[in-house]
Amino acid sequence: MAKIVILFDFDRTLIDGDSDNWVVTEMGLTEIFHQLRFTLPWNRLMDRMMMELQSQGRSIDDIKSCLKKMPIDSHIIEAIKSAKSSGCDLKIVSDANQFFIEKILEHHDLVDCFSEIYTNPTSLDDNGNLRILPYHSDALPPHSCNLCPSNLCKGLVMDHLRASSSNDQIPRRFIYLGDGGGDFCPTLKLRECDFVMPRTNYPLWKKISDNPLLIKAEVKEWSSAEEQQRILLQLVSTITKEEDS
């Protein structure tokens, strides 16, 4: 039987909204965010927003409280727990950040469902302030992918996962769920036995629609949390039956 690995993007896929935008809006940073929007790469812009919160006297507990209000649709929660209980290996590959993702998942009792989270790391500085760092450290040579932002190439993450499973006695089959342009690079790494689930009318879906001959995986689009749940669990069931037969 193949091991089913499910890779979730986070923003606008696992959650319906965007965790960065949620914090910016809920914590009153909209004005300064738009002032700086096109002066910094997104990852560094969000780090700058954390410094702005510090200057306003906001604490890390204030950020935690904000993140706890971020909803996750009940259909997604049910899908995650069902896939986990079915023996799937669930991972997150996201251009959000470690702190935001973990606090949202913890609040919804989901963090233990995921074996790994590949995202931009976070740390606390000497003053106890949250800092957001790039996944691909500035200390390392830049990746050469022109499809992805400089701070995170999801295709390299997929290469790592593929390489780490090369000696497995049990083959892996991947299901990749995403919405953004940054999800196109890992989609190109999927094989004929894998599946990609793009969100309808979002950038990943549009890139796949414009470049169908580049995609080896079977495409299963979704447009709502309920549809995502239904299709994902159907795929898990189908793969399991195929491998058991």
From Swiss-Prot:
The keyword Hydrolase applies. GO terms for molecular function: inorganic diphosphate phosphatase activity; metal ion binding; phosphoethanolamine phosphatase activity; thiamine phosphate phosphatase activity. Disruption phenotype: No visible phenotype. Pfam families: Put_Phosphatase. The keyword Hydrolase applies. InterPro entries: HAD-like_sf, HAD_hydro_PyrdxlP_Pase-like, HAD_sf, Pase_PHOSPHO-typ. The active site is at 9 (nucleophile), 11 (proton donor). Its cofactor is Mg(2+). Gene3D superfamilies: HAD superfamily/HAD-like. Its EC number is 3.1.3.100. One of its GO terms (biological process) is thiamine diphosphate biosynthetic process. Mg(2+) binds at residues 9, 11, 179. It catalyses: thiamine phosphate + H2O = thiamine + phosphate. It is an enzyme of class 3 (hydrolase). Keywords: Hydrolase, Magnesium, Metal-binding. HAD-like hydrolase that has a thiamine monophosphate phosphatase activity in a heterologous system. Does not contribute to thiamine monophosphate phosphatase activity in planta. Monomer. Belongs to the HAD-like hydrolase superfamily. This is Thiamine phosphate phosphatase-like protein.
